Amino acid sequence: MARTPGWESEYREYVATRRRPLMRTAYGPIPDAQFAQAQDWQSAYTTSVGDVLVMMGHAEELGGWRCRDCDEEKVAGGTLYRQDYSTDAGATWWFTISFVRDDGSFVNVLESVGAPDQQGARDQRHVSDAQMAALARDPRLTF
């Protein structure tokens, strides 16, 4: 599986300096002065084969956690969910790890890969499930 060197350190820098808040009632970023009203934070990265998206939010952002057909693992502080799927008849595959804390807040880490089939997409991934799970459980990703 291919890895992007320095990806984790680039992510840490992004968390520290370039997060943009979103509000459920607004489409897109809110003004920096209103950051305390944000209900979720999102950051996106483009890779050579797709994208990586990191989202974190309050429990009320989703109205309760739902994940049909997810693999579920209880871990310290919450539950990890894993799901692989395609939304466009197999042209793009999504590999998803979600961490739902005991208080209902969450972090989703998604990697999209364009490939003709799931195994081809899996072989091209830049971020492993273990890396995604560690990122989702990063204690800095909280309100």
What does each model-identified segment do?
Residues 1-143:
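Intrinsically disordered, low-complexity prosegments and terminal tails associated
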